[in-house]
Amino acid sequence: MNKEKSLLIDYVDPFIGTTNFGTTNPGAVCPNGMMSVVPFNVMGSADNTYDKDARWWSTPYEHTNCFFTGYSHVNLSGVGCPELGSLLLMPTTGELNVDYKEYGSKYKDEQASPGYYSNYLTKYNIKTEVSATPRTGIARFTFPKGESHILLNLGEGLTNESGAMLRRVSDSEICLLYTSDAADDMQCVD
């Protein structure tokens, strides 16, 4: 009889600690990596139990929430302080709308494993998938036919950034300058 081999990674559940003030998130992250790509579901809807603007909140994700406003990049997991959680990337379809309270979507079919996260945005019929490498994050959005958009929200995030600028360096590189209420200096992300 052949037994399937189990790998240690098969026992990892990224959803542990994502509710009840555990402050962890199920996002895609590479061990010792610079980038973490995390579902951001803590702003923009009265349907959410926990909203970062209604109370002090220290994580970009809460498992019991149901309203998704994008993937944040550069996150801390499990630390309990409301820092980073910025650079929100959100796929949409239909007419362009840039108000996160209106463009956000409920989601279903959430899946997470080490280095991978996906969900299905019910408002737009979009499957979203993200992964991470030691230096970057990658996203794949499966759109239905018709008009579609990928929004980059530089003005909202876990810490409510107070300023940002995006500069296209080349076809494959952008430079982002942003500042948050907690930092006085501008930072560049390539």
Residue ranges, per PLM feature:
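Accessory carbohydrate-recognition regions in carbohydrate-active enzymes
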Residues: M1-S180
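Single conserved hydrophobic/aromatic residue that forms the stacking wall/gate
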Residues: Y178-D190
